[in-house]
Amino acid sequence: MVSNQDYTEKIRQLMKDHNSWMESSINLIASENITSSRVKEALLSDLSHRYAEGLPGERLYEGCRYIDEIEELTIELSKRLFRAEHANVQPTSGVVANLACFFATAEVGDPIMAMEVPYGGHISHARVSAAGVRGFQIYTHPFDFENMNIDADAMKKKILEVKPRIILFGGSLFLFPHPVEEALEAAEEVGARIMYDGAHVLGLIAGGYFQDPLREGADMLVGSTHKTFPGPQGGIILCREELAADIDEAVFPGLVSNHHLHHVAGLGIATAEMLEFGAEYAAQTINNARKLAENLHELGFNVLCEHLDFTESHQVVMDVSDIGRAAEISKRLEANNIILNKNLLPWDDVNRSDDPSGIRIGTQEITRRGMKESEMSEVAEYIKRVVMDGKDVRDEVAEFMSSYTRVHYAFEDSEAYKYMEIQ
């Protein structure tokens, strides 16, 4: 008979098995990353047990002496890294951060403009998620299919026509910078706020690459802190000082009661790492993405936007409809320890998200494991051998990845996937 304690050991073993599998895999999921041992240490701390409702110095709970200092430090580091007037580090996810900005700057029934999901927009920008929860009328940005980006000229005309309350940039399929500056004049004319969902590219922005939304005219830069930004899971809002009070109130008490204090500490540590190493890390991530795209293209894959050097972000996007079903291809790759995801492309039916034509790849995690351009040809070759040649490369991938088991771009040299066992 299985005892209750046996279940705890089963779960612990599954966690260990997961860590071992990730260490042996080429993880190319564009929305994931690994944290340093110092960030992991924060996540294991007593802060995970505590409550601190409200802002630092204005808590509704006692016992926050050190918690206040940690959050204040994290706020100051975030403002410094992104050169922002105000930062709120309490959102528990990127979607919660988006919702807070929606509540702070617009009302039910207001029109907004955002990317349609197959064009690259995040689900939280759509009627089925956060934007719909807020009750917005959602208009979509005109899209340039060839260049995989918003059509800037058509966008400006549509802003004047629709008069949106929020012009929302950013997305989850995100190869090139969005036309923030180009929207500014029209936004001012109709009284719209510009919001930039930088969840996927936050680490690139922090490193000084991709684009600089706050300098280009965005009122709010919002994102999750665990994709290209190598922190713990959570959200952040960076904004103009004039919006600070409304956004803070939308976060608490509006959407978050107690925020995750151990994640705030981890975010502060990750932000310090990015101040030190962010430029080098971001540049290498983008260089790796371009090189991987080039290698995949040379091997016969239909990698999008060859005429634009494929990408300016961490992402590489392929249309695999000419060689198979993306859903089946991604499963075959997973069986060979190559982890990525199927993805809707602009020409796909939004109702067929389970059977799209695209594959999305991200290079941020393998970059943090120490890979550079020279390794991208090997990664591409493994993908080709599975997808086009039908080979089993699982053992070869595990052997290949055994040389890349440590976290780079951090203050200490540590194992990336070590199971942190507490006795």
Swiss-Prot record:
The modification N6-(pyridoxal phosphate)lysine is found at K227. Pathway: Amino-acid biosynthesis; glycine biosynthesis; glycine from L-serine: step 1/1. Gene3D superfamilies: Aspartate Aminotransferase, domain 1, Type I PLP-dependent aspartate aminotransferase-like (Major domain). Keywords: Amino-acid biosynthesis, Cytoplasm, One-carbon metabolism, Pyridoxal phosphate, Transferase. One of its GO terms (biological process) is glycine biosynthetic process from serine. GO terms for molecular function: glycine hydroxymethyltransferase activity; pyridoxal phosphate binding. Optimum pH is 8.1. The keyword Zinc does not apply. It catalyses: 5,10-methylenetetrahydromethanopterin + glycine + H2O = 5,6,7,8-tetrahydromethanopterin + L-serine. InterPro entries: PyrdxlP-dep_Trfase, PyrdxlP-dep_Trfase_major, PyrdxlP-dep_Trfase_small, Ser_HO-MeTrfase, Ser_HO-MeTrfase-like, Ser_HO-MeTrfase_PLP_BS, SHMT-like_dom. The record marks H226 as: Plays an important role in substrate specificity. Optimum temperature is 60 degrees Celsius. Pfam families: SHMT (PF00464). The keyword Cytoplasm applies. One of its GO terms (cellular component) is cytoplasm. (6S)-5,6,7,8-tetrahydrofolate binds at G121, H122, I123, E242. Its EC number is 2.1.2.-. It is found in: Cytoplasm. Its cofactor is pyridoxal 5'-phosphate. Catalyzes the reversible interconversion of serine and glycine with tetrahydromethanopterin (H4MPT) serving as the one-carbon carrier. Cannot use tetrahydrofolate (THF or H4PteGlu) instead of H4MPT as the pteridine substrate. Also probably exhibits a pteridine-independent aldolase activity toward beta-hydroxyamino acids, producing glycine and aldehydes, via a retro-aldol mechanism. Belongs to the SHMT family. HAMAP family: SHMT. Homodimer. This is Serine hydroxymethyltransferase. It comes from Methanothermobacter thermautotrophicus (strain ATCC 29096 / DSM 1053 / JCM 10044 / NBRC 100330 / Delta H) (Methanobacterium thermoautotrophicum). The lineage of its organism: Archaea, Methanobacteriati, Methanobacteriota, Methanomada group, Methanobacteria.
